[in-house]
């Protein structure tokens, strides 16, 4: 009887110990389950972060593509601007050549004008000489007339001298008319040269204005090129910053993937512990 009683007490103690272990295992199982749910929640949160990181990465890639397109467009504009500057440079060079030709023509015209002025001065001196000769002939004619009045006996000689004086006077008048014609031609030539000089002066002023406008356009093109260069540098900086952001996001994605892999390993280990716990409970 004592043996049965002891055995029953031992069985009762063993039952109590088993119940206590069952309670402990249930609490342990509950903790493991809570930990598993927590890990699953963390994994879900990590998946959400990974999706958001992927979305951010896609947006950054789109932004990078847009920046690359803008950079390409900026390069095209810069190329076009350089072509325009080259064209303006060629045009300025041609204008400079035209200006040199015009200057040469102006020099030739001034030389011709100076020669015409000298010719006009010579014609004026000739005209004055003719006038002096004409006055002298008139005085001589008067003298002959006085001599004719004073000495009729030498009338024939006086008539001859008179005829000679008249002939010289006619020659002088013809020379005078020729001198006047040459003077008028010289004056007309001077007027023509002055008109040509005025036209050349106007052309030179027009060339100077065109050159100033070309210089202004060239300055505008240089300013545009500087602006495009600054915009290109800004685009390159933005592209570099975008690449840095992409690299940073890629590192974050890599870290998240590593964390996810570690969580999966922990979840796998936790599942193994739970399976082992269930096996131990089932064994009891």
UniProtKB/Swiss-Prot annotation:
Keyword terms, alphabetized: Coiled coil, Repeat
Disordered as annotated region, ranges: 111-131
Keyword DNA damage: no
Family classification: Belongs to the tropomyosin family.
Record note on domains: The molecule is in a coiled coil structure that is formed by 2 polypeptide chains. The sequence exhibits a prominent seven-residues periodicity.
PANTHER family registered for this protein in UniProt: TROPOMYOSIN
Protein name as it appears in the record: Tropomyosin
Organismal lineage: Eukaryota, Metazoa, Spiralia, Lophotrochozoa, Platyhelminthes
């Amino acid at each position: 009887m004592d043996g049965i009683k002891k055995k029953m007490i031992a069985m009762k103690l063993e039952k109590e110990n088993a119940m206590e272990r069952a309670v402990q295992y249930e609490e342990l199982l509950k903790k493991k389950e809570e930990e598993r749910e927590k890990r699953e929640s963390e994994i879900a949160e990590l998946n959400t972060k990974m999706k958001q990181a992927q979305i951010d990465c896609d947006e950054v890639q789109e932004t990078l593509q847009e920046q690359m397109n803008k950079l390409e467009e900026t390069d095209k504009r810069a190329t076009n601007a350089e072509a325009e500057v080259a064209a303006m440079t060629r045009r300025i060079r041609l204008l400079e050549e035209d200006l040199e030709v015009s200057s040469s023509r102006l020099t030739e015209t001034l030389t011709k004008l100076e020669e015409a002025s000298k010719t006009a001065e010579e014609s004026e001196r000739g005209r004055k000489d003719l006038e002096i000769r004409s006055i002298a002939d008139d005085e001589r004619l008067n003298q002959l007339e006085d001599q004719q009045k004073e000495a009729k006996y030498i009338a024939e000689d006086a008539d001859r001298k008179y005829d000679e004086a008249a002939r010289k006077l006619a020659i002088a008048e013809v020379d005078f008319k020729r001198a006047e014609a040459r003077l008028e031609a010289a004056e007309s030539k001077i007027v023509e040269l002055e008109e040509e000089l005025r036209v050349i002066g106007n052309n030179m002023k027009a060339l100077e204005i065109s050159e100033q406008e070309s210089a202004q356009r060239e300055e505008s093109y240089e300013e545009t090129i500087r602006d495009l260069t600054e915009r290109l540098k800004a685009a390159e900086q933005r592209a570099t910053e975008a690449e840095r952001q992409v690299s940073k996001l890629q590192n974050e994605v890599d870290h998240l993937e590593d964390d996810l892999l570690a969580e999966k390993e922990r979840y796998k280990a936790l599942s193994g512990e739970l399976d082992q716990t269930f096996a131990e409970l089932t064994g009891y």
